[in-house]
């Protein structure tokens, strides 16, 4: 913890002791100052009592604590002499030691052992004496500015620093709010769209329910009107029925009975006519079905006859072709059986006419060329 809160300016031990000797007054003077502290404003006293034992390193390095800046202004206005005197001492020390920034810029020595102890003593002194703490802080800031000439000097005005810090914070907050608002807006839009869709669906559902209710009401009204009409018809028919049921004279009763008989006869006649019509319709249907069946049978028979005729014609043609083939085959056979010389001799041999008184040699008759020999009878197929 002590190393984290040490001062950022690191100097050799000899220079550090000289600076401490010049900056810190003697112990007796410090004790006198502690015994008789200068009166401070209420704000400085409150903040001095509330200052912690260990000051954060960030505020020590940058010197941008807003509360300290305000206190520095108030305390600096009330005690300008002390502040100016200390600044002059620092400037004199820097003029006497011109080699310090070169050494510091060239190589920063590593912190030695007594540094944590010195840091704790300084923190203890700063916590006890707020005036010394503020003055030392200002001196350290001026030393840092002179020792690090390349470093950008931070604004010493606490109001400007606070303004910039507030601007940065406001910008960061604005960016964070914008980033947070974008998903929130998208979610809100989605929710709004979902609500609109739900409302539209509810409206449609309500419209459908209203339409169904209207249809039901309309149907109910129609049914009621029909029932009313039937009721009126019954009411209109009821006087006639009442007249019929009332006690009447003999003539009226006979007329009434005659009318009833006529009605019954007409009903019976109508029923008989309907039955007769139904029977005629059934008979006509049977006739039509029978005619259709007969027609189908005739068509089937005609088709069968045609097929048989075709088959018989085909068989007759085949037989005729077979006979022609057989005849041709027999002629070829005869031609092959007769030798060629005999056929020529038969053609050249003269015919002798017998003379009366001469004995004629009986020779078997030979068939002339081209005549067909009688083949053994073959069974003939019956012609169709």
UniProtKB/Swiss-Prot annotation:
InterPro entries: Involucrin2, Involucrin_CS, Involucrin_N
Leader peptide range in chain numbering: none
Tissue expression as described in the entry: Keratinocytes of epidermis and other stratified squamous epithelia.
Post-translational modification note: Substrate of transglutaminase. Specific glutamines or lysines are cross-linked to keratins, desmoplakin and to inter involucrin molecules.
GO annotation, biological process: keratinization
Residue stretches in coiled coil: none
GO cellular component, one term: cornified envelope
Keyword set, alphabetical order: Cytoplasm, Keratinization, Repeat
Basic and acidic residues: compositionally biased ranges: 56-65, 80-134, 179-208, 268-308, 315-336
Pfam families linked to this entry: Involucrin2 (PF06994), Involucrin_N (PF10583)
Compositional bias segments (type: Low complexity): 137-146, 239-267
Cystine residue pairs: none
Region (Disordered): 1-384
Highest taxon listed in the record's lineage: Eukaryota
Localization (cell): Cytoplasm
Family statement drawn from the similarity comment of this UniProt entry: Belongs to the involucrin family.
Oligomer status and interactors: Directly or indirectly cross-linked to cornifelin (CNFN).
Function (record text): Part of the insoluble cornified cell envelope (CE) of stratified squamous epithelia.
Protein name: Involucrin
Species in which this protein is naturally found: Otolemur crassicaudatus
